[in-house]
Amino acid sequence: ACATGAAVTITGTIGSILLFGCEPKQKENAEHSILGQTVFSPLTGELKSLKDVNDPTFSEEILGKGIAILPKEGIVYAPFDGVVSALFDTKHAIGLTDDQGMELLIHVGLETVNLGGTHFEVHISQGDLVKKGDPLITFDLQEIQKTHDVITPVLITNADDFSEIVVQKEFGPVKAGDAILTVKK
């Protein structure tokens, strides 16, 4: 009886997908739950406080609230589903906006604007829709760190639109895709 019930459930789910083109809705979207919106790490490396960034524009939260990551790999991934709202010609920074209006800036390294795009490659364009985990930018970590600090601020630039921004992971090792921030309206 259990096997038959499971088969009916599976068949019913597949049938609804095939007939109606949609999957049954979950009670809550994990990335936009009642607890807040989740930002996942765009990089693998070491999670740090913004206070550890040797640039007052970031450490004093002038551009927004968030965290910093000292990258161990040269790949920036989408930290949530959203749209590429800003892409700098110098390829060192990207702005993303999610469907709830949260605006996020990922700024690879300090003073890397001066590289003029050298050692960076973008895989998306401004206006593109991206999914969590999509590769956005690759960069030559070894070459850039020869001349620049590669610590990467990850900022909610419209932080004033939210009641709370909570760091979800202890400072230390972080993998791309780990939950790092929760942002609450």
Task: Write out the residue ranges for each language-model feature.
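Short glycine/threonine/proline-enriched tight-turn/helix- or strand-capping micro-motif at secondary-structure
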Residues: 51-75
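Short, glycine/small-residue-enriched coil/turn segments at secondary-structure junctions
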Residues: 35-39, 67-92
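Zn2+-dependent peptidoglycan hydrolase active-site motif and core
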Residues: 83-113
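Conserved, short, structured surface segments that act as functional micro-motifs
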Residues: 134-168, 173-174, 182-184
